[in-house]
Amino acid sequence: MDKMIKATVVVVDDDSMMREMLKLILRGEDYSVVGEASNGQDAITQCEKLKPDLVLLDIIMPKMDGLQALEEIHKVSPESIVLMVSADATMDKVAEAIKKGASGFVVKPLKAASVLDRIETILKARKKG
């Protein structure tokens, strides 16, 4: 019997180890990781092509940072929920991310349980809304 997929996800982080860790966490909980990117420009391309349910988006990346990419992702894939994942959790960054349309923020270093709890909360809120 096939497992029920909870959501499709694109993982965006310039650190390949972080992407691998996030993919392991997500796949272990029946999320389908359909794409990944190492910078904001590639993230936009992935989101436009794949229209994921959820995007895990780092802030500090080369070529285009996550805050710039966030606005473009909402243009090319307006139904995608974006959860920011960053070590840069100053109040200014969090406020800017939320203002630009992020649904939440998870601070690095990551704990699997906190990432999954935040994702589940966001997805449940989307279903109710």
Predicted regions and their residues:
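Two-component/phosphorelay signaling modules centered on CheY-like receiver
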Residues: 16-35
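Acidic catalytic/metal-coordinating carboxylates
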Residues: 39-42, 65-68
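Active-site beta3 strand of CheY-like receiver
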Residues: 50-56
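Receiver (REC) domain active-site loop signature in two-component systems and cognate sites
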Residues: 61
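Short, conserved "switch-loop" micro-motifs in signal-transduction and mechanochemical regulators
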Residues: 88-89
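C-terminal output helix
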Residues: 92, 110-120
